[in-house]
């Protein structure tokens, strides 16, 4: 019987193992994320190219596949396409002058065509600065909003959370704060995460109309952009801020808002079949925000002396601050401004709930004169809120309690502020001095706004007040001449309301 002979060599296929270390194959596509085989040398957050033209970033590594997020929305990617890793991690392109730039996650200019080439780049993901390179927060970052600068002050290098329901004035506080930096030598970065394109355009137009784009950068992704782009956007904004801080600059960065950032990350991890945790968020939701916000610090003089002040925003539902993401970010930051919808609807703008809001380290950075004039304001407002409830029930109050109610009403009216009309440090000093020294007790609450406007108008017309404003950084307490000037201004206006 004849035996059949097989030539096994002709069935052998040579597998290039070295090639598989740097290359892979698209196995599955699912709503903006890719499951890929190969890529044995891949690292987390490494940039990749699909079919040599589509940009992606590695977001998931496990034994079965490599998970890639697509930066650009596209329907041109097919199963079987080649994937190759690049020689760098995901980064944002930078220009010599970042002022006035409106860019996306990778540093590409938005809303205008530009042939200008980037001069450098900065990685989106970096470690927190070492503890020995960080300095204390001792310099103020004035928002121009009386209730914040007096009761919950913010210092340069601080992380202060702004949280509240939808349409409670969070973005308006951020925009007012940016506009108030026009003469403060602070570079501002507004990071829009997954917002409507029309809303982003409206914010940009407001900044442009108030000449704030001259010292600002906008990093934006719209709701129509990919989930990966929305997830990466705050890190891109922080990378730009770090590049400016390394030049010794003071930077203010605003994240609008981190709730949408957490939602985008939740969607990505669920697509990668990662097990969900509380409220379906993944287990490392705390880490993605802490690793971002802890990069905002005040550096010591030996390491440039620059600072990053972060104002992250969180959207709450029905004023619930005990939800997963709000409690996470509250524990990461140095304080919070809690905005209440009912205050906003009653016309109390900015709608800051003083009883819940706190600034843990901002007091050390507050201007000493404002610190002295503000020391009992929180108590006055807290007592007013308690006694006001008794008045609502028709209970009679003694003379001392009625004085507390009167002071509370006056202070509440003083803290009301029109949008896009920030107050300078000396403006706030005049207002608080008038309140603390009893000059407003006979002014009806309905006329407080008019009194305040006329008071500032009279003050700005005096040469000695202008000189006081120019020198305020070097003045730590009011002299007799300053006190006399303030009382003359207040009494002149007071006679018109008596």
Curated annotation (Swiss-Prot):
CDD domains: ATP-synt_F1_alpha_C (cd18113), F1-ATPase_alpha_CD (cd01132). Keywords: ATP synthesis, ATP-binding, Cell membrane, CF(1), Hydrogen ion transport, Ion transport, Membrane, Nucleotide-binding, Translocase, Transport. It is a peripheral membrane protein. It is an enzyme of class 7 (translocase). Coiled coil: none annotated. It comes from the Bacteria. It is found in: Cell membrane. GO terms for molecular function: ADP binding; ATP binding; proton-transporting ATP synthase activity, rotational mechanism. InterPro entries: ATP_synth_asu-like_sf, ATP_synth_asu_C, ATP_synth_asu_C_sf, ATP_synth_F1_a_nt-bd_dom, ATP_synth_F1_asu, ATPase_a/bsu_AS, ATPase_F1/V1/A1_a/bsu_N_sf, ATPase_F1/V1/A1_a/bsu_nucl-bd. GO terms for cellular component: plasma membrane; proton-transporting ATP synthase complex. ATP binds at residues 164-171. Pfam families: ATP-synt_ab, ATP-synt_ab_C. The record marks 357 as: Required for activity. PROSITE patterns: ATPASE_ALPHA_BETA. Its EC number is 7.1.2.2. It catalyses: ATP + H2O + 4 H(+)(in) = ADP + phosphate + 5 H(+)(out). Produces ATP from ADP in the presence of a proton gradient across the membrane. The alpha chain is a regulatory subunit. F-type ATPases have 2 components, CF(1) - the catalytic core - and CF(0) - the membrane proton channel. CF(1) has five subunits: alpha(3), beta(3), gamma(1), delta(1), epsilon(1). CF(0) has three main subunits: a(1), b(2) and c(9-12). The alpha and beta chains form an alternating ring which encloses part of the gamma chain. CF(1) is attached to CF(0) by a central stalk formed by the gamma and epsilon chains, while a peripheral stalk is formed by the delta and b chains. Belongs to the ATPase alpha/beta chains family. This is ATP synthase subunit alpha 1. It comes from Listeria welshimeri serovar 6b (strain ATCC 35897 / DSM 20650 / CCUG 15529 / CIP 8149 / NCTC 11857 / SLCC 5334 / V8). The gene is atpA1.
């Amino acid at each position: 019987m004849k035996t059949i002979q097989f030539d096994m060599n002709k069935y052998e296929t040579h597998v290039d193992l070295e090639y598989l270390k740097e290359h892979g194959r698209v196995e599955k596509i699912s709503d903006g994320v890719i499951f890929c085989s190969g890529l044995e040398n891949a690292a987390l957050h490494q940039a990749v190219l699909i079919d040599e033209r589509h940009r992606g970033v590695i977001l998931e590594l496990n034994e079965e596949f490599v998970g890639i997020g697509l930066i650009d929305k596209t329907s041109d990617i097919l199963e079987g396409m080649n994937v190759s890793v690049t020689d760098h991690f995901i980064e944002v392109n930078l220009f010599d002058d970042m002022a006035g730039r409106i860019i996306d996650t990778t540093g590409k200019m938005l809303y205008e065509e530009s042939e200008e080439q980037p001069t450098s780049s900065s990685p989106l993901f970096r470690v927190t600065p070492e503890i020995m390179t960080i300095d204390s927060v001792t310099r103020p970052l004035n928002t121009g909003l009386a209730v914040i600068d007096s009761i919950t002050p913010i210092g340069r290098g601080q992380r202060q959370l702004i949280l509240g329901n939808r349409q409670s004035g969070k973005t308006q506080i951020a925009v007012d704060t940016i506009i108030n930096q026009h003469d403060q030598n602070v570079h501002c970065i507004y990071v829009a995460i997954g917002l409507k394109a029309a809303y982003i355009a409206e914010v940009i137009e407001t900044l442009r109309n108030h000449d704030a784009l001259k010292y600002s950068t906008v990093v934006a992704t719209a709701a129509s952009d990919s989930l990966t782009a929305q997830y990466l956007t705050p890190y891109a904004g922080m990378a730009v801020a770090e590049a400016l801080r390394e030049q010794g600059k003071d930077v203010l960065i605003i994240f609008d808002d981190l709730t949408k950032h957490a939602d985008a990350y939740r969607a990505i991890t669920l697509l990668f079949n990662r097990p969900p945790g509380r409220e379906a968020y993944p287990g490392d939701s705390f880490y993605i925000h802490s690793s971002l916000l802890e990069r905002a610090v005040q550096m010591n003089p030996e390491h440039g002396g620059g600072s990053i002040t972060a104002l992250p925003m969180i959207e709450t539902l029905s004023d619930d601050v005990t939800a997963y993401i709000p409690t996470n970010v509250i524990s990461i930051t140095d304080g919070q401004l809690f905005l209440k919808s009912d205050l906003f609807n009653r016309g109390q703008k900015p709608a800051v709930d003083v009883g819940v809001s706190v600034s843990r380290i901002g007091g050390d950075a507050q201007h000493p004169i404002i610190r002295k004039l503000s020391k009992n304001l929180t108590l006055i407002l807290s007592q007013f809120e308690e006694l006001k409830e008794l008045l609502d029930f028709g209970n009679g109050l003694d003379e001392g309690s009625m004085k507390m109610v009167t002071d509370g009403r006056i202070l509440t009216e003083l803290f009301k502020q029109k949008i896009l009309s920030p107050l300078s440090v000396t403006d706030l000093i005049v207002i608080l001095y008038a309140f603390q020294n009893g000059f407003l007790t006979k002014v009806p609450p309905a006329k407080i706004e008019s009194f305040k406007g006329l008071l500032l108008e009279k003050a700005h017309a005096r040469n000695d007040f202008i000189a006081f404003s120019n020198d305020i950084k070097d003045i730590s307490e009011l002299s007799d001449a300053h006190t006399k000037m303030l009382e003359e201004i207040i009494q002149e206006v007071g006679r018109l309301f008596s």
